[in-house]
Amino acid sequence: METSTNQINISLNNNTFPNHMLYKQYKDSGTSSALILPAVMMNVAGIPGIAANLLLIFVTIQNNKLRGSANYLLALTAFFEILHQSAHFLFLFITVSGINFINYSTALKFQLHSIFGLTAAQTSMASIAADRLLSVLFPLKYYKLNIRLYFTIHIILAFISGIWMSINAINFSNKYPTLPVTGYISDLLVLDMEIIFPFIMLLCGINILLYFFVWIVQIMMEVLIQKPQSRLLKSLILIVSIVIGGYVIGCLCKIIIDHFLNLNDIQIWTVNQFAGILINIGASAETPILYIFSSFYREAINKQLRSIFYKRTNSKM
């Protein structure tokens, strides 16, 4: 532990460690708008997303019409995105309190679940794409699947990817336990942990490719899809365009900013916040898109919201 601390101190002194200028600038500055504003922006994007994803999970559980495999996988993705976006609470607390920096190992205790969720959400999105491809390639066999076994397989795949990335984070934390970070989740994804970005890009590419195949199969084979399923597919394609688009643009921006632009690390850290906001907008888009473009989801969400507000109104009377 002492050796690792000494290595970090030497690296900081030699200006070679991630965000070393940011650390020197703000480690003893107390509360600073330069840190608080990004934390607030992340939570402004993230908190509505958490609420929307919770609502999606709840209506999926409550509504008997939302019992298809795609519906379950959408709810699963929403759950993982909640884990991901909850990371921003620590960032806000650290900056508003004026602490500004904590050790990597400490941050990981509060944000390991978010790294798990971030990775698993992408795997779950790929599962949805694979599910849609199966539904158009083998429609008769698809509707005879054992839904519990089928869904369990997708859950296991998502958990495996999330656990794998979590193990990488734990190993990195053991290697550099006292690395100072702001509590922003992207600060945990440095050096060895940058492996998460090509992994996310790979899954995004798989998503796009699978939906492209879905489109091709529908055109070439003229597969007939029931209207509700067709509307769901259109919603899913739009979700992929926005959600995956947010992740792709965010990851590409981070890679370009970190490795190709001649900026100091304070400027890099600040600009990267905008990439993070894009990712969070994408992570929050699932429920609004389903509400707008799927009549089943819109009906279920409206019913649930009326129920919530009706109960609150009665409780006040």
Which residues does each PLM region occupy?
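Seven-transmembrane-like multi-pass membrane architecture, highlighting hydrophobic TM helices
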Residues: 1-317
